[in-house]
C-alpha cells in the first residue's frame, strides 16, 4: 500500500491564491513521478481554484456538521464537495471541536461521500476519534507542529500507541502521522511505526522550493 501525504496549506501566504495552485502542481508532478498519492488542503476560498486547475486530490481544512440553511459563516459538506474537494480535515489543533461537533462533521462529510481525517493530539483522543469511524486519524502532538522536530523521533510511542489503539477499535480506520514532518527520513520513520502516511504543512509550504522538498519527502519510499 502506497502512503498518503496530505499537505495542509493553512493560511500561509505562500499557499494562498496562485501560490496554492503552484504548490498543487508540484504535488501532482511529484505524486505522478513517485506513484504516491499527495493531496492538498487549501483555504476555503482556494478549493475551487485549485480543484479546477490541477488534477490533484483536494481536501478542505475544516467542515461544519450542518446542512444548507440558516448557518451564516459555516462551511457545509455539499458546498465543499461542489467546490471540488474529495475530503476534509476535522478537528485540526488550530481549529478544535467538541466531540459532538466532530461526530456531526464526520456524519455530514460521509453523507456527501467525502473522505474524513480527524486530527488528534494523543493516544486517548485518537482512540475516541477512531470510534467515530473516519477514514483516517492524524495524530499530531501540538507542541511539535511547525517545530521541525518530527513526532516520529520526538515521541514515536504516540504513533505506535495510536496505531495499536485504532486497530483494537476499528481496523478499517487508518493512522496518519503529523507534526514536524518535512524530510524523507521522517516519512520513512512514520511508515515504519505503523502509520499509512503523513499530514504536514510548513516544511513544504514555506520551503524555498516546495517541489524539491516534496521530492526529498518521497525519496526513501
UniProtKB/Swiss-Prot annotation:
First-level EC class = isomerase
Note the SUPFAM superfamilies from the entry: Triosephosphate isomerase (TIM) (SSF51351)
Q: Which Pfam family would be a valid example here?
A: TIM
| GO biological process, any | glycolytic process
Q: What is its main location?
A: cytoplasm
Binding-site residues for substrate, renumbered to this chain: 8-10, 145, 180, 201-202
Q: What is its EC number?
A: 5.3.1.1
Keywords noted in UniProt: Cytoplasm, Gluconeogenesis, Glycolysis, Isomerase
- UniProt superkingdom: Archaea
Q: Name one GO molecular function term.
A: triose-phosphate isomerase activity
Query: What is the active site of this protein?
Result: 92 (electrophile), 140 (proton acceptor)
Which cellular compartments is it found in? Cytoplasm
Catalyzed reactions: D-glyceraldehyde 3-phosphate = dihydroxyacetone phosphate
Q: How does it assemble?
A: Homotetramer; dimer of dimers.
Q: Which HAMAP family match?
A: TIM_A
What functional role does this protein have? Answer: Involved in the gluconeogenesis. Catalyzes stereospecifically the conversion of dihydroxyacetone phosphate (DHAP) to D-glyceraldehyde-3-phosphate (G3P).
Q: What is this protein called in UniProt?
A: Triosephosphate isomerase
**Source species of the chain:** Methanococcoides burtonii (strain DSM 6242 / NBRC 107633 / OCM 468 / ACE-M)
